[in-house]
Amino acid sequence: MLSVVEGILILVVISESVFGVLGNGFIGLVNCIDCAKNKLSTIGFILTGLAISRIFLIWIIITDGFIQIFSPDVYASGNLIEYISYFWVITNQSSIWFATSLSIFYFLKIANFSNYIFLWLKSRINRVLPLLMGFLLISCLLNFAYIVKILNDLKMKNDTVWRLNMYKSEYFIKQLLLNLGVIFFFTLSLITSVLLIISLWRHNRQMQSNVTGLRDSITEAHVKAMKVLISFIILFILYFIGIAIEISYFTVPENKLLLIFGMTTTAIYPWGHSFILILGNSKLKQASLRVLQQLKCCEERKNLRAT
């Protein structure tokens, strides 16, 4: 039986999941329509991949969490936890990779530095994306091999319990090794986002001496971009904090509140960042306003028919 606090957090997680699927589904739909019109750009490809991977990631977070909370015995056979582990690696790594690619793309497109390496990368932005794809593939293959090793070791020990029956220190070391690829992309994304914020801030200071009208419009755009980046960094950090909380649940499996709180914290990022992207991207924002306008018109027609 769940406590009141646990029940409230479960409702929050469900709400986050619904918003996440709707927000990312909208992003994916808008860019898929552009793809059908042969208008899909590099940024559109990244946003589409990010949206699709996050939808699957949300389902994995919810499915895995609810099984652990309500039916932990389902994992006793070992097969389900194996499939979920594989799927988790694919969706989590893909989501982080696309988020990192988005950060790098904006960094190379918008930032302004005189550094030779930066200028070299900026002139070869179309080659950076395939390079990151190669890193993702290597990271996924390494993690797959490591997961297979862990699960095979458990089967050889005839450990039929879904919880990893090992010392706490050993478990955390295995999780750290398993997430090395993700940590690399996470660090890279944070570095590029911080550098872009610094570049925007410096450029904003340089614009202070320009004409007032131009200065105000550019300053507003820069402040908006910095707010989006700072929000992204905060949500990204919360996502990894949530994962750490969920990992720590394995050491105290009787504390369901810890797991539910971890799920709530983890799910903030995939849905929160999707709405930040919609509000920060002019094309997505205009499309969302058109959808809201259509919904408003439909509601008005329905009210007129009712009267």
From Swiss-Prot:
CDD domains cross-referenced by the UniProt entry: 7tm_TAS2R10
User: Acetylation as a keyword?
Assistant: no
Q: What is this protein called?
A: Taste receptor type 2 member 10
Bilayer topology term: Multi-pass membrane protein
What is this protein's function per UniProt? Receptor that may play a role in the perception of bitterness and is gustducin-linked. May play a role in sensing the chemical composition of the gastrointestinal content. The activity of this receptor may stimulate alpha gustducin, mediate PLC-beta-2 activation and lead to the gating of TRPM5.
Extract one GO molecular function annotation from the record: bitter taste receptor activity
Which ranges make up the Cytoplasmic topological domains here? 28-42, 122-126, 201-227, 279-307
Record's keyword terms, sorted: G-protein coupled receptor, Glycoprotein, Membrane, Receptor, Sensory transduction, Taste, Transducer, Transmembrane, Transmembrane helix
What PANTHER family does the record tag this protein with? TASTE RECEPTOR TYPE 2, TASTE RECEPTOR TYPE 2 MEMBER 10
Q: Which gene encodes it?
A: TAS2R10
Additional note from the record: Most taste cells may be activated by a limited number of bitter compounds; individual taste cells can discriminate among bitter stimuli.
Which residues get glycosylated?
N92, N158
Q: Which GO terms describe its cellular component?
A: plasma membrane
Q: Which family does it belong to?
A: Belongs to the G-protein coupled receptor T2R family.
Taxonomic source organism: Papio hamadryas
Which ranges does the record mark as transmembrane?
A: 7-27, 43-63, 101-121, 127-147, 180-200, 228-248, 258-278
Question: Where is this protein found?
Answer: Membrane
Coiled-coil annotation: which residues? none
Asked if the record carries the keyword Transmembrane helix, the reply is yes
- Predominantly, its location class is membrane
Q: InterPro entries recorded for this chain? A: TAS2R
Please list the residue ranges that the record places on the Extracellular side of the membrane: 1-6, 64-100, 148-179, 249-257
